[in-house]
Regions:
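Active-site loop/oxyanion-hole signature of alpha/beta-hydrolase fold enzymes
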Residues: 59-98, 102, 276
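Conserved hydrolase catalytic core segment
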Residues: 93-137
């Protein structure tokens, strides 16, 4: 997790160790939740955009990756509890929550369990809270966007994963192969960050804990009073209809912003789009 100029580090004591984070800015407080699960924090540019839009941002490395604790459990309940621990440590009673991908799903979980703590949610390229949230089509969509050689190498790595012989280098390479496919224009995609870190154990346990809570989450979202704006690219491999639109359809105070020609990282592919969506979220919350 790289600190931007002006960001101040903090640590929150939680079961198993600490959660490490960064905060900066003046204005309404916003908690940022990164994607994954089991990935290093990567929302520096998004935090900067939101601070320029008038928010004070707090972002943290979710457990499973240093400098936060690498101890489990890594299930949804624990990740939600860690987020609340960050709010409590910071003395933040009510916040805007901005989540990306898996982090958007965590934001939905927070809104369903602690609506009194959330002023509103901006869910960017999010895994949805209805059905499987679009998860089942993500892998096939990514593989369809890379070349034959990439698909063949990806299949070889998957075989090693299934056999239990995959290395950490295999995990990084697997993400590197599909990384360009997350973007609306794969040829123009930036390189995979050199400091990316992955925890397969965290990712697997977190994902496995989603399905058992699916029915409760969908029921809770249907009556959730928290306003939410979904910001989603029409070329996101995490399909818009199965994720953002399906979830918005069951929520009483939800809107969807569709970005043409944009993939999974709107703030990188179309700078300013998250700040624009924030304006709509504030209006929805009034």
């Amino acid at each position: 997790m790289r600190a931007d100029p002006g960001e101040t580090p903090f640590e929150v004591t939680v079961p198993g160790g600490v959660i490490a984070g960064l905060r900066a800015g003046v204005g309404d407080p916003a908690l940022l939740l990164h994607g994954g699960p089991g990935l290093s924090e990567h929302l520096g540019e998004l935090a900067d955009e939101l601070r320029h839009a008038g928010l004070a941002t707090s972002r943290f490395q979710q457990r499973g990756i240093a400098p936060s604790t690498v101890e489990g459990p890594f299930d949804v309940d624990r990740h939600v509890a860690d987020a609340i621990a960050v709010l409590d440590f910071s003395g933040l009673q009510r916040v805007w929550v901005v989540g990306h991908s898996w982090g958007g799903y965590l934001a939905l979980q927070l809104a369903s369990r602690y609506p009194e703590r959330i002023m509103g949610v901006l869910a960017i390229g999010t895994l949805g809270g209805v059905g499987d949230g679009g998860a089942s089509s993500l892998g096939p969509n990514l593989l369809a966007r890379i070349d034959d050689a990439g698909r063949a190498e990806s299949a070889e790595i998957e075989q090693r994963e299934e056999a239990g012989t995959a290395s950490y280098a295999d995990e990084v390479r697997s993400l590197e192969l599909v990384w360009p496919a997350y973007f609306g224009d794969p040829a123009a995609a930036p390189p995979l960050p050199a400091d990316i870190a992955i925890s397969a154990a965290c990712g697997e346990e977190a994902v496995a804990s989603i399905e058992p809570d699916a029915e409760r989450l969908e029921r809770s979202l249907a009556t959730c009073p928290v306003p939410i704006v979904f910001l989603h690219g029409d070329l996101d491999p995490l399909e818009l209809e199965a994720s953002a639109r399906a979830t918005a359809a069951v929520m009483p105070r939800a809107e969807v912003i569709e970005l043409a020609g944009v993939g999974h990282f709107p703030w990188l592919e179309r700078p300013g789009s998250a700040a624009d969506a924030l304006v709509k979220l504030v209006a929805l919350a009034i």
